[in-house]
């Protein structure tokens, strides 16, 4: 790194700090804190302990967000000031030190930028993910299983826990469908970027003529809802079916009809759960999955009219293409982010892609 590159880095960091300011709005946070302090000075305020606890929680959140912005801005300002002094005094030793610290400074600011982008109401929730293969039989079913493994590996890398809810084996290979919960801090905030249709182009391992095939699979992501979020589902709007569990379920599978499938007529949403021996527990989990999907659908309608974008799996609401032949490239169609490290991506190294989507979405929103 040289002086010019470091100067350009500082400009980039300044832009990132401005992004953070747009999202956190420090002026508004300061006003909120002032209002809360005025509230706390009212002698009657503490009489309502429930309200006082809620306000205290909001105060801590505002303080934390404001501190995040202040620390970030200070870090960048300090680097700029030190750089200008070193340049004016031709202090090569200090400049070398700044250049050495540049990658970690950039990494830290990028991390802060991403974290503040995950400040949505449900971003801190666990994520319920359903993967469904598109048309094409074995090809797309195998592609669905590759995506499932990719998310398992990604979860491992991030230290998230995974709980399997439903698993349907494919006829020859792969899976007919899978549903699982990723549990961890900001799991939904990160995973929501994966919502959409994923396209694979490769030389088929199932084709004796070694022809190139295109396969599709849909990934649906919704937040695991707290019990206090009330979503009413009328009995007349759903059908509940029982069936024997199959696939990766353990010794009890196929012995009793403990698996549950719920069909929601107004939306056409179908959810399945077979992860427990108890039909009652599977039904409760399936209802939770349905509520989460209905909630996510409503969010999408409000935010971007996504109800218009839903289409059959194929060339519809496609978000990403994975080309393994004749060349190797994974490309996100929303951000145009591309990488030739297809094996790394399919092994769960997708943070860079996810972060590019979060930055893109946040910048668009602001």
UniProtKB/Swiss-Prot annotation:
Name of the molecule in the record: Peptide chain release factor 2
Modified residues (N5-methylglutamine): 251
The keyword Protein biosynthesis appears for this protein: yes
Species name: Helicobacter hepaticus (strain ATCC 51449 / 3B1)
Role summary: Peptide chain release factor 2 directs the termination of translation in response to the peptide chain termination codons UGA and UAA.
Key word NADP present: no
TM spans (from-to): none
Alphabetic keyword roster: Cytoplasm, Methylation, Protein biosynthesis
PTM statement from Swiss-Prot or TrEMBL: Methylated by PrmC. Methylation increases the termination efficiency of RF2.
Annotated GO MF terms: translation release factor activity, codon specific
Pfam families noted in UniProt: PCRF (PF03462), RF-1 (PF00472)
């Amino acid at each position: 790194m040289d002086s010019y590159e470091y100067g350009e880095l500082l400009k980039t960091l300044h832009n990132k700090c401005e992004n953070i300011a747009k999202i956190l709005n420090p002026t508004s946070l300061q006003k909120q804190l002032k209002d809360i302090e005025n509230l706390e000075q009212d002698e009657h305020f503490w009489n309502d302990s429930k309200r006082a606890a809620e306000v205290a929680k909001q105060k801590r959140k505002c303080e934390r967000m404001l501190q995040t912005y202040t620390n970030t801005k200070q870090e960048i300002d300090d680097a700029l000031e030190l750089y200008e002094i070193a340049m004016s005094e031709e202090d090569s030793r200090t400049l070398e030190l700044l250049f050495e610290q540049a990658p970690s400074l950039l990494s830290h600011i990028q991390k802060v930028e991403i974290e503040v982008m995950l400040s949505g109401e449900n971003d801190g929730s666990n994520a319920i993910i359903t993967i469904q293969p598109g048309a094409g039989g074995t090809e797309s079913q195998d592609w669905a299983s590759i995506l499932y493994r990719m998310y398992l590996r990604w979860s491992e890398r991030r230290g998230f826990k995974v709980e399997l809810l439903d698993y349907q084996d494919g006829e020859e290979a792969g899976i007919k469908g899978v549903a699982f919960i990723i549990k961890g801090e900001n799991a939904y905030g990160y995973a929501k970027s994966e919502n959409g249709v994923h396209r694979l182009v490769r030389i088929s391992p199932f084709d004796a003529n070694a022809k190139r095939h295109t396969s599709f699979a849909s990934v649906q992501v919704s937040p695991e809802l707290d019990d206090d979020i009330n979503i009413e589902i009328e009995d007349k709007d759903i059908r509940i079916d029982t069936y024997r569990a199959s696939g990766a379920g353990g010794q009890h599978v196929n012995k009793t009809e403990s698996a549950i499938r719920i069909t929601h007529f107004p939306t056409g949403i179908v959810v399945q759960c077979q992860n427990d021996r108890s039909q009652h527990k599977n039904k409760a989990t399936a209802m939770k999955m349905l509520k989460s999907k209905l909630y996510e659908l409503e969010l999408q309608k409000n935010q971007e009219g996504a109800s218009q974008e839903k289409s059959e799996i194929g060339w519809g609401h496609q978000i990403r293409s994975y080309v393994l032949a004749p060349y190797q490239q994974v490309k996100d169609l929303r951000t145009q982010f591309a990488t030739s490290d297809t094996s790394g991506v399919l092994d769960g190294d997708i943070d860079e892609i996810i972060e590019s989507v979060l930055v893109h979405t946040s910048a668009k929103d602001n």
